[in-house]
């Protein structure tokens, strides 16, 4: 779900999403 927001940043955003998957709401690229 949050991955959609990260998709705008491309692959880098997706990788960050995976790294922040445990804390997606607290991640630097969450919202």
Curated annotation (Swiss-Prot):
It catalyses: 2 superoxide + 2 H(+) = H2O2 + O2. GO terms for cellular component: cytoplasm. GO terms for molecular function: metal ion binding; superoxide dismutase activity. It is an enzyme of class 1 (oxidoreductase). It comes from the Eukaryota. It comes from Striga hermonthica. It is found in: Cytoplasm. The keyword Metal-binding applies. Its EC number is 1.15.1.1. The lineage of its organism: Eukaryota, Viridiplantae, Streptophyta, Embryophyta, Tracheophyta. Belongs to the Cu-Zn superoxide dismutase family. This is Superoxide dismutase [Cu-Zn]. Its cofactor is Cu cation; Zn(2+). Binds 1 copper ion per subunit. Binds 1 zinc ion per subunit. Keywords: Antioxidant, Copper, Cytoplasm, Metal-binding, Oxidoreductase, Zinc. Destroys radicals which are normally produced within the cells and which are toxic to biological systems.
């Amino acid at each position: 779900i949050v991955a959609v927001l990260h998709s705008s940043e491309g692959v880098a955003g997706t990788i960050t999403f995976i790294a922040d998957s445990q804390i997606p709401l607290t991640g630097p690229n969450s919202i």
